[in-house]
Swiss-Prot record:
CDD domains: GIY-YIG_SLX1. The keyword Zinc applies. This is Structure-specific endonuclease subunit slx1. Residues 351-380 have a biased composition (Basic and acidic residues). GO terms for cellular component: Slx1-Slx4 complex. Residues 15-97 form the GIY-YIG domain. Catalytic subunit of the slx1-slx4 structure-specific endonuclease that resolves DNA secondary structures generated during DNA repair and recombination. Has endonuclease activity towards branched DNA substrates, introducing single-strand cuts in duplex DNA close to junctions with ss-DNA. It is an enzyme of class 3 (hydrolase). The keyword Transmembrane helix does not apply. GO terms for biological process: double-strand break repair via homologous recombination. Residues 190-219, 344-391 are annotated as: Disordered. It comes from Neurospora crassa (strain ATCC 24698 / 74-OR23-1A / CBS 708.71 / DSM 1257 / FGSC 987).
Amino acid sequence: MSTTTTQIQPKPIPALYTVYILRSQPRHASLYIGSTPHPPRRLSQHNGLAKGGAYRTSKISLRPWNMVCLVSGFPSMIAALKFEWALNNPHKSLHIPAEKRAEAVKGLGRRKTGHLKRPRKSLVGVMEALRMLVGVRSFGRWPLRVHFFEEDVWRVWERGGWKAKSGGGGVGELGDLKVEVVTDFGSPTAPQGAGVIGMGEEAENDPHDDDDGDDAQDENKHGIYALPLDYAPIKDYVAKSQEIWEFERQGSCVVCKEAMVAGRGLYAICPNTSCEAVGHLDCWSRCLLKQETRRMKIDEGDEILPVKGECPKCHGEVLWGDMMKELTLRIRGQAEVEKLLKKKKRRRAAKGKEKGKGKVADEKGNNAEGRNTKGNREVKTTPQRVVEDSEDSEFLDIACLQ
């Protein structure tokens, strides 16, 4: 009897994967925590405007729901699900200190199964758990960013001691670890008509119901609608990387100075626009970790992966998360790369058509003006044939690594 096994193909670091917090607009005490790569679509599902959603958000009396806060920057769906579970279960998560877990379950009984009852969610409690989770070592070195879309929720966060700088964004700090805090109170985060169409399909949080949707097209680009849902923010970085390998400009490793052969190793590239520094992955890691040990005054060898540092060539800041997103996209994300290139190609084709139409119009005008008479004969001048130049399409080979 033969058995077949399905091999799971590794994926690039996603363009966006978030853990979000919903709050009921009619009843602010009702909160919901979930994860998604597409916040606008997921919010529509929770509000009954699209199929999907979750059983706990299906009550009409609690709709519409507002997405008041989210955390972005997770390197994979699994990473986001782990963080989501810990935020939903701070009384069980080993990422939370034991004394804090004891406080959370103090006075609560047990279920018939013997398990501790889950403490009731409150905004203060969720913010406290969120602060602890983004600060622990298991999550604190990820390129996470905390977004706030309601001012009162941000105020609760501030009272906890992680104050953002003025100007709508900033960095909260806990010891040597930092998290970027972004505020955007420009518009409501619940779509109009929420809860009117119906309950949709009731489904518990399914990690697969959010994948690969079209970008949200909303005229009001605030809040969750302003989040980048694809790899467009690193398109120039990806294009630079492709050109380096296509024209064999990688040269020697920026750290160890050894020659690099395409296709025979994992090579990372400086993300700064004017810099083409390329190096072995382990060389970049050692270089940036040494900088961290000096800057943060920690013992060498305590960490495995860096967070950020300075490029040895251009001396600009490099973020490890950005470098790994480009690397994994170059190695594992052929489909995503082609999607990026198609958008670029369509824009070029549209410009070419407009250019061609202009040339044809000029040709017709010249043809009309080119008719003259010589004696009693009409002489027609033959217009020069217009040949529209075609631009060579670029090809980007991109991949990713975790």
